[in-house]
From Swiss-Prot:
<feature type="region of interest" description="Disordered">
    <location>
        <begin position="424"/>
        <end position="522"/>
    </location>
</feature>
<dbReference type="GO" id="GO:0005829">
    <property type="term" value="C:cytosol"/>
</dbReference>
<feature type="region of interest" description="Disordered">
    <location>
        <begin position="291"/>
        <end position="363"/>
    </location>
</feature>
<feature type="modified residue" description="Phosphoserine">
    <location>
        <position position="164"/>
    </location>
</feature>
<feature type="compositionally biased region" description="Polar residues">
    <location>
        <begin position="104"/>
        <end position="132"/>
    </location>
</feature>
<feature type="compositionally biased region" description="Basic and acidic residues">
    <location>
        <begin position="329"/>
        <end position="339"/>
    </location>
</feature>
<keyword id="KW-0805">Transcription regulation</keyword>
<dbReference type="InterPro" id="IPR051834">
    <property type="entry name" value="RING_finger_E3_ligase"/>
</dbReference>
<feature type="compositionally biased region" description="Low complexity">
    <location>
        <begin position="455"/>
        <end position="507"/>
    </location>
</feature>
<dbReference type="GO" id="GO:0006511">
    <property type="term" value="P:ubiquitin-dependent protein catabolic process"/>
</dbReference>
<feature type="compositionally biased region" description="Basic and acidic residues">
    <location>
        <begin position="214"/>
        <end position="229"/>
    </location>
</feature>
<dbReference type="InterPro" id="IPR001841">
    <property type="entry name" value="Znf_RING"/>
</dbReference>
<feature type="modified residue" description="N-acetylmethionine">
    <location>
        <position position="1"/>
    </location>
</feature>
<dbReference type="GO" id="GO:0005634">
    <property type="term" value="C:nucleus"/>
</dbReference>
<feature type="modified residue" description="Phosphoserine">
    <location>
        <position position="228"/>
    </location>
</feature>
<feature type="short sequence motif" description="PDZ-binding">
    <location>
        <begin position="621"/>
        <end position="624"/>
    </location>
</feature>
<keyword id="KW-0007">Acetylation</keyword>
Length: 624
């Protein structure tokens, strides 16, 4: 009897708590509608465009007011740790959802997340430049496939530190040479700081000329790099392969500067401080910093060709993404760094270099596969122009633009995976077991990055896989003197400081390629890859706008609900209108809460009730 009484009391308390929770939510919903009703049209658009309204009942009126005041005062200053380029444990959020992070991009435009799951670690960085409108998305993935992953990591990190001791002279000199940091640069992870700097004789940008002229130590470093460079890539090849102009992309840039480097210059400084080497490409090509664009208007021909010299406000903003994966057979490259091992790794000939390009609706994709010393590197680069951008910044980074971008990312993942799997079937060397093992490993060893001014990254553990932030330029098309499209996939893999580079030579350009459906192994993959099935949509839909622009939405009629109006309910939130509610009226005469229908129309172009097109097709504009 006592047990039944206690159970009844417990259930009564639970139901009372549920009722209180429901009442609190209803109160918050009422406060939300009242808050929106009292907003001026300017304040409403400000909060809507920055996705600060949220869902009715989700936030209190005080929270909404705080968001409004915060957005009016301007974005908060960037983390001081970020300006220093150091790692911070505050960024580590293992449980955070990547989807939540991507949604936050639309609010802040500058976010960093990192985490770890098992033997996999990831780091994602988003940067928006309000001056140029450029959006840079960088995803780096490190995978340690050794059975003793923890031991291997602990074993290699001291090795990396010891090796970097050889380069104190070089790194400290580069830090002195490059005191100015880029305000929008991503903070590097450990593997980025340990990546290989490539130093070759290519025409430098303005920043690189300045860096080289300041320090004889830097020239000595470059000389050491040249002495240890593989005989397969003599310096005489560099001028012939370093430049090529692609008319459809209107830029030219050197690509081989990252493909070859010295094991003694493997550890370089943070992304912001590095000017020589891989960042040459970033500066000359994609220009993530608007202030830097203005200051370098008189830069090199690379800069002029990319449209920087015309001013960041005049050239179309661009999203650049890089998706990379390195496949390494477990058990290889575990020996300690030595002259003999470096010589062996550099004496093996790159083979099976393949390049493939496709362009659809302005989205240019480039794929490359190359192999050297048993390390096979696959690179997929996507260049996405944003055609509709306001001067205030990346205003089109709504859920529509984000989803379009992510569809391109995931399509790139799919094509890259297909490229890898189909290539594995025709692998000329290695046993069947090795091929099967590589095919299985490739599912968890892919990484993507989008670049503006970042540097190539390589892993510091013996069998890890990482993405390259600067490879947005590294895998873009280059060419030989014959003018054919070609590509250099300039990854440098280091196994316990054993460097091996992979470079693509020339490949024929082909339009279109049949792709088999790609499946993703979710069991051991990173959270980011769980987005694949959601965003990997039909490519036929890439060119179709999925919603209305803010200007198109604002042109729709809006009114306030009056006391004499017939009682109606918003079909989006299923809430009755009250006096003073702001309603938006569609051409089909259906009305909705302004905040409800605006969110709907940002991702859809039809009325939620009758499914009629809100705008005639002739009046639609592409939102991407």
């Amino acid at each position: 009897m006592e047990n039944s009484d206690s159970n009844d009391k417990g259930s009564g308390d639970q139901s009372a708590a549920q009722r209180r929770s429901q009442m609190d939510r209803l109160d918050r919903e009422e406060a939300f509608y009242q808050f929106v009703n009292n907003l001026s049209e300017e304040d409403y658009r400000l909060m809507r465009d920055n996705n600060l309204l949220g869902t009715p009942g989700e936030s209190t009126e005080e929270e909404l007011l705080r968001r409004l005041q915060q957005i009016k005062e301007g974005p908060p200053p960037q983390n001081s740790d970020e300006n220093r380029g150091g790692d911070s444990s505050d960024d580590v959020s293992n449980g955070d959802s990547i989807i939540d992070w991507l949604n936050s991009v639309r609010q802040t435009g500058n976010t960093t997340r990192s985490g770890q799951r098992g033997n996999q670690s990831w780091r994602a960085v988003s940067r928006t430049n309000p001056n140029s409108g450029d959006f840079r998305f960088s995803l780096e993935i490190n995978v340690n496939r050794n059975n003793g992953s923890q031991n291997s990591e602990n074993e290699n990190e001291p090795s990396a530190r010891r090796s970097s001791g050889e380069n104190v002279e070089n790194n400290s000199q580069r830090q002195v040479e490059n005191p100015r940091s880029e305000s929008t640069s991503a903070r590097p992870s450990r593997s980025e700081r340990n990546s290989t700097e490539a130093l070759t004789e290519v025409p430098p940008t303005r920043g690189q000329r300045r860096a080289r002229s300041r320090s004889p130590d830097h020239r000595r470093t470059r000389a050491r790099a040249e002495r240890s460079r593989s005989p397969l890539h003599p310096m005489s090849e560099i001028p012939r392969r370093s430049h090529h102009s692609i008319s459809s992309q209107t830029f030219e840039h050197p690509l081989v500067n990252e493909t070859e480097g010295s094991s003694r210059t493997r550890h370089h400084v943070t992304l912001r401080q590095q000017i020589s080497g891989p960042e040459l490409l970033s500066r000359g090509l994609f220009a993530a910093s608007g202030t830097r664009n203005a200051s370098q208007g008189a830069g090199s021909s690379d800069t002029a060709a990319s449209g920087e010299s015309t001013g960041s406000g005049q050239r179309p903003p661009t999203i650049v993404l890089d998706l990379q994966v390195r496949r390494v057979r477990p058990g290889e490259y575990r020996q300690r760094d030595s002259i003999a091992s470096r010589t062996r790794s550099r004496s093996q000939t790159p083979n099976n270099t393949v390049t493939y390009e496709s362009e659809r609706g302005g989205f240019r994709r480039t794929f490359s596969r190359s192999e050297r010393a048993g390390v096979r590197t696959y690179v997929s680069t996507i260049r996405i122009p944003i055609r509709r951008i306001l001067n205030t910044g990346l205003s089109e980074t709504t859920s529509v633009a984000i989803q379009t971008m992510l569809r391109q990312i995931m399509t790139g993942f799919g094509e890259l995976s297909y490229f890898m799997y189909s290539d594995s079937d025709s692998e000329p060397t290695g046993s069947v077991s090795n091929r099967n093992m590589e095919r299985a490993e490739s599912r968890s060893g892919r990484g993507g990055s989008g670049g503006g001014s970042s540097s190539g990254s390589s892993s510091s553990s013996s069998s890890s896989s990482s993405s390259s932030s600067s490879s947005s330029s590294s895998s873009s098309p280059s060419s030989s003197s014959g003018g054919e499209s070609s590509e250099t996939s300039s990854d440098l893999f280091e196994g316990s400081n054993e460097g091996s580079s992979s470079s693509g030579s020339s490949g024929a350009r082909r339009e279109g390629r049949h792709r088999a459906p790609v499946t993703f192994d979710e069991s051991g993959s990173l959270p980011f890859l769980s987005l694949a099935q959601f965003f990997l949509l039909n490519e036929d839909d890439d060119d179709q706008p999925r919603g209305l622009t803010k200007e198109q939405i604002d042109n729709l009629a809006m009114r306030s609900f009056g006391e004499n109006d017939a009682l109606k309910t918003c079909s989006v939130c299923i809430t009755e209108y009250t006096e003073g509610n702001k309603l938006r009226k569609l051409p089909c005469s259906h009305e909705y809460h302004v905040h409800c229908i605006d969110r709907w129309l940002s991702e859809n172009s039809t009325c939620p009730i009758c499914r009629r097109a809100v705008l005639a097709s002739g009046n639609r504009e592409s939102v991407v």
